[in-house]
Amino acid sequence: MSLNEPSIKQRTSSKVEKKEGYPPMYRVVLHNDDYTTMEFVVQILITVFGKSLEKASIIMLNIHKQGKGICGSYTREVAETKVNTVHHLAREQGFPLKSTMEKE
């Protein structure tokens, strides 16, 4: 090891410090219910989460079959905004669609 090369301990602690600098991420989850149409869920996934029609359809089927599905991972503020947007749009259309966020 040369005098200018950092020790393993220095390199490791440097990597840990960088990782700790990232904000925590949150998964936004949509939950299945007996009233919200599959078409509306696909529309939400496209408009709110920027999914393609194909990807939105796959996520919607997961929600339908498994009871819930992950729409994406975001920082806390972005996840909160997306959850609130889903609830607002669902209520406007008379659907009880539920969206939550889970810390990763």
From Swiss-Prot:
Pfam families in alphabetical order: ClpS
HAMAP family (alphabetical): ClpS
Subunit organization: Binds to the N-terminal domain of the chaperone ClpA.
Gene3D superfamilies: 3.30.1390.10
GO BP annotations, alphabetical order: protein catabolic process; proteolysis
Family membership: Belongs to the ClpS family.
Top-level taxon of the source organism: Bacteria
Protein name per its UniProtKB record: ATP-dependent Clp protease adapter protein ClpS
Function text: Involved in the modulation of the specificity of the ClpAP-mediated ATP-dependent protein degradation.
PANTHER family in UniProt: ATP-DEPENDENT CLP PROTEASE ADAPTER PROTEIN CLPS, ATP-DEPENDENT CLP PROTEASE ADAPTER PROTEIN CLPS1, CHLOROPLASTIC
